[in-house]
Design a protein with these regions (language model features):
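Axial heme c-ligation environment in periplasmic c-type cytochrome domains
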Residues: 40-51, 56-91
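Blade/loop signatures of beta-propeller domains
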Residues: 102-152, 309, 314
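Short, solvent-exposed loop/turn elements at domain surfaces
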Residues: 43-44, 129-136, 160-166, 185, ...
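Sec/Tat-exported extracytoplasmic proteins
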Residues: 31-32, 36-39, 62-66, 71, ...
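Extracytoplasmic/lumenal domain signature
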Residues: 55, 144-159, 184-205, 210-219, ...
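Sequence/structural segment immediately N-terminal to covalent heme-attachment motifs in c-type
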Residues: 16-38
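Solvent-exposed, polar/charged alpha-helical surfaces in well-ordered, non-transmembrane soluble domains
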Residues: 22-26, 30, 56, 60, ...
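N-terminal export/targeting leaders of redox proteins
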Residues: 1-22, 89-114
Length: 601
């Protein structure tokens, strides 16, 4: 779908500004609107979302990011700058307000981290290295009786952001959170004042992981995260000073979209790719990207090992009609944070679809690798024959797989649980709603497999969109049950020993849950695609409390902020507080740029 120039001009922040602006519209319309604004390309942000981006973000994408090889290589540098400024409505180099030292709420003191070392925490993606997303009552600092008294404590605006999709962490009484602008912030949990900021230079989507390091001159603790360019950073948790940066995967197609997991002095880093979004273009040499996991020394950033999901490097296959070389096998992006099993000395992670046909056996699978060497211990394929590229819908190019799969992936982290009888399980949740229990002590042998909700009459899956009734970014687990939200709407619970459904509650008709679930005794927390944060009873899913985040907020740092969809991340709970980001300007979500903190009042 091509937007008429007049309509495009009316929507842009710089509409009618100058002849140069009109030229910018022309380049955008000619080169970009084939995907942006076309319903067939649901993963391409529509123009109204792009208009909220900073010029630096657009220019970065055209020069070094996802769009560099899709369309950026067809533009001159002047055209890239023109498009960046026209679509954003801002001039390049004018976005300085994101630095902490430009904010009015700088903390007046920065006490040693050890003073708050005993405060309860939420660290990393899943609160623990088993990724259960479950807090004890003591660590949560809340009970079910406290939930109706939750009130907004503070709101922090992420400057120039359109997505607050990086899940915060709360450690040492501080909230660490990343932004799609590339900034990392350390906030005081009690007041929201900002201790420091760090600019990675590229979008950060990962949760923050905090761990001890042995680095002279540091505080002894680092904040670890990855960025869109597949860089991994360690910054001092006390000062925000960069301790080291590493690039564990040399392939330029790689990126990091999930949090690294810290265990025993090592970081286990998941590696995904942007190639799935670009490779249907006929001029693209499809496909070479390989998902995987890398292990780094947490104190130095040195790579200890790298294991790819595809065991062999891609080989030349054939050339398309344009003479462009095609490659394979490829794919298997890792979109989730690895899970640690100290008993088996193993790391577990889920893999994405293949980007070439036929699909490799380790695509859409759970893999177990040895934590010391990266050697593959076992794998279990959840969905077979899932070869997928964005843009391979009704109209397909020669680059598209011979048989296009449903794009199911394993987006959520596999979760390691110990049942009441002492047995252990790796639980896997999937986009189409399948839930599997594997035995980690029997090389991933299947124990049970169920569907969380069953089919929905009249609601059909679409490529690249979570299947109705499915589970996207993960569930929460105690010793007895798994608690989850469904992408079609409704929340439920399954018995971990048998897979039997314990309850399924619609909660709110028509609301989709595309975020991760969080729980503590008596309470399950979930954000919705329309921006509502909900708390339901763990026993039956009945609604206890809700808060509408899709509105403007007065922020402690004076940044204009609004909420949007709550997706990809989940709420965190620790030390009497619930914290969540609101805004998800992709996949049809509502943009937003606010981090919200709640407490009992």
């Amino acid at each position: 779908m091509v937007l008429p120039g007049a309509v495009l001009a009316q929507q842009s922040p710089l509409a009618g500004a100058s002849a140069a602006t009109e030229a910018g519209y022309g380049v955008f319309q000619q080169k970009c609107t084939t995907c942006h604004g076309n319903p067939q390309f649901e993963k391409a942000p529509p123009p109204e979302v792009l208009f909220q981006y900073t010029p630096e973000r657009i220019y970065d994408s055209l020069t070094k990011g996802v769009m560099a090889t899709v369309i950026g290589n067809q533009l001159t540098d002047a055209q890239k700058r023109l498009v960046s400024e026209t679509i954003s409505g801002q001039r390049l180099g004018t976005a300085g307000i994101a630095d902490a030292d430009k904010m009015p709420n700088r903390c007046t003191s920065n006490p040693p981290l050890q003073q708050a070392a005993q405060r309860p925490a939420w660290n990393g993606w899943g609160v623990n290295t088993q990724n259960t997303r479950f807090q004890t009552t003591a660590a949560a600092g809340l009970t079910a009786a406290d939930i109706p008294q939750l009130k907004l404590k503070w709101a922090f605006g992420l400057p120039n952001s359109t997505s607050a999709y990086a899940q915060p962490a709360m450690v040492f009484g501080r909230v660490f959170v990343g932004a799609d602008t590339g900034y990392i912030y350390a906030l005081d949990a009690d007041t929201g004042c900002v201790h420091w900021s760090f600019n990675a230079g590229h979008a950060v989507r990962t949760a923050m992981t905090i761990g001890p390091v042995k680095i002279r001159g540091s505080s002894g603790f680092a904040v670890f995260f990855g960025d869109r360019q597949a860089n991994v950073y360690a910054v001092d948790a006390h000062t925000g000073k960069k301790l080291w940066a590493a690039h564990p995967e040399p392939d330029y197609r790689a990126r990091i979209t999930a949090a690294p997991t810290y265990h025993d002095g090592r970081l286990y880093v998941p590696l995904s790719s942007f190639e799935e979004f670009s490779a249907s273009t006929p001029t693209w040499e499809c496909c070479k990207s390989l998902g995987g996991v890398a292990a780094l020394d947490a104190s130095t950033g040195k790579r200890l090992w790298l294991t790819h999901v595809v065991p062999d490097l891609p080989k030349p296959l054939h050339k398309n009609s344009l003479g462009v070389q095609q490659w394979g096998p490829a794919g298997g992006a890792v979109w989730n944070s690895p899970t640690v099993d100290p008993v088996r000395h193993a790391i577990y992670f889920g893999t994405g679809d293949a980007t070439t046909y036929p699909a490799i056996e380790t695509s859409d699978a759970v893999m177990a690798v040895h934590m010391d060497t990266g050697r593959v211990l076992w794998s279990y394929q959840v969905h077979k024959e899932d070869s997928f590229l964005v843009g391979c819908g009704a109209t397909r190019t020669e680059n598209c797989p011979k048989v296009v799969g449903p794009d199911w992936d394993i987006p959520a982290s596999p979760v390691l649980v110990k049942l009441r009888d002492g047995s252990r399980r790796v639980i896997v949740v999937t986009k189409p709603g399948d839930v599997l229990a594997l035995d980690p002590d029997q090389r991933g042998e299947l124990v049970w497999r169920v569907n969380a909700s069953g089919p929905v009459v009249g609601d059909k899956p679409r490529p690249g969109v979570p299947t109705p009734g499915g589970i996207y970014w993960g569930a929460a687990f105690d010793a007895d049950a798994m608690y989850f939200g469904l992408t079609r709407g409704g929340m439920g619970a399954l018995d971990l020993a048998t897979g039997k459904r314990l309850w399924l509650n619609p909660v709110q008709a028509g609301v989709r849950y595309n975020s991760a679930t969080t729980a503590f005794p008596g309470v399950v927390l979930q954000g919705t695609s329309d921006g509502v944060l909900q708390a339901v009873a763990m026993a039956d899913g009945n609604l206890l409390w809700s808060f509408e985040t899709r509105r403007e907020f007065e922020t402690v740092n004076g940044v204009k902020a609004v909420g949007g969809s709550i997706s990809a991340l989940g709420p965190i709970v620790a030390d009497g507080m619930v914290i969540v980001g609101s805004g998800f300007a992709v996949l049809g979500g509502q943009p937003g740029n606010v981090v919200l903190a709640f407490s009992r009042q």
